[in-house]
């Protein structure tokens, strides 16, 4: 996730479960360890030094305060469990993104079935909204969801799929563009092997992270 206040990126790692801060070139600035094995899958900046984290196995969202002096991940200020469509412990929440509304937070379920859930988040809490399931931006050919990002500046939702090797860019009103993550497209010399996270900034720079420890940066050209 992109933090526009610090102008740095934040990501999560598993085994050990940690939050990692990176600069725009992918250099690690600090590692913030957690107090156990939490199976972190996604992180989203909410503003005001607040972050939402998703835990795949537990189907849980938690909020944490992280500032420039944080060295160990503090206890969650709030948590929410969405126990929906539990078919596999390894097919849970894979992406988080702030939505169009001031307090909207979108949560992506990886597969079985593919789905976006919409929650309402206040400064101290998360709660499920009345319109729980959002289907508008999930094309039929998508095999999984491995990351999610909403660009509020342009009103675009980015849905990342490592099994389909694409990013689907949607305006939530029906317009859609597909970005291939295979060799020969967008300056890629090799396929992105396992894309797991996506973010962008206010300058139209797009970042994708992939296992094993790969970092990609895409910048807009005059013709794109």
Briefly describe each language-model feature range.
Residues 1-224:
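Sequence/structural signature of beta-propeller domains
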């Amino acid at each position: 996730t992109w933090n526009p206040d610090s102008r740095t990126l934040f990501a999560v790692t598993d085994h050990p479960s940690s939050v990692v801060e990176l600069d725009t070139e992918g250099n690690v600035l600090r590692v913030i360890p957690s107090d156990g094995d939490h199976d972190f899958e996604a992180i989203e900046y909410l503003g005001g030094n607040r972050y939402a984290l998703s835990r795949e196995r537990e189907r849980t969202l938690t909020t944490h305060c992280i500032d420039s002096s944080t060295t160990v991940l503090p206890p969650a200020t709030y948590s929410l469990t969405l126990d929906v469509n539990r078919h596999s412990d390894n097919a849970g929440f894979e992406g988080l993104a702030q939505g169009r509304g001031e307090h909207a937070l979108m949560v992506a379920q990886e597969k079985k079935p593919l789905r976006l859930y919409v929650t309402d988040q206040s400064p101290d809490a998360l709660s499920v909204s009345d319109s729980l399931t959002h289907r508008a931006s999930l094309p039929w050919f998508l095999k999984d969801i491995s990351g999610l990002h909403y660009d509020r500046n342009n009103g675009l939702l980015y849905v990342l799929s490592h099994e389909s090797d694409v990013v689907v860019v949607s305006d939530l009103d029906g317009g859609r563009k597909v970005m291939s993550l295979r060799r020969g497209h967008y300056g890629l010399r090799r396929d992105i092997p396992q894309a797991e996270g996506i973010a962008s900034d206010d300058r139209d720079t797009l970042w994708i992270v992939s296992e094993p420890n790969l970092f990609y940066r895409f910048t807009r050209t005059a013709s794109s």
